[in-house]
Amino acid sequence: MIEVIVNDRLGKKLRVKCLSTDSVGDLKKVLAVQLGTAHGKVALHKGGVNLKDHISLDDYEVHDGTYLELYYL
């Protein structure tokens, strides 16, 4: 179990617990529930790279304590 910190750059920082084997799409669905928006309306970035939904967090080297940027589409 890892904890990922997501910053939406509007003042919200969310801490989300997930598995490193979860896909980016799974993480976006959890975030969408917490934010009250549709998961298709958010994008996650790490180091300026847009994370694709079907790839696992481990493949993007997202580990415990990793910061991700959240953008609203």
Curated annotation (Swiss-Prot):
UniProt-listed InterPro entries: Hub1/Ubl5, Ubiquitin-like_dom, Ubiquitin-like_domsf
Superkingdom as given in the UniProt entry: Eukaryota
Domain (Ubiquitin-like): residue spans on this chain: 1-73
Keyword tags: Ubl conjugation pathway
GO MF, one annotated term: protein tag activity
A GO cellular component annotation in the UniProt record: nucleus
One GO BP annotation of this record: mRNA cis splicing, via spliceosome
Keyword tRNA processing: no
Protein name per its UniProtKB record: Ubiquitin-like modifier HUB1
Organism ancestry: Eukaryota, Fungi, Dikarya, Ascomycota, Saccharomycotina
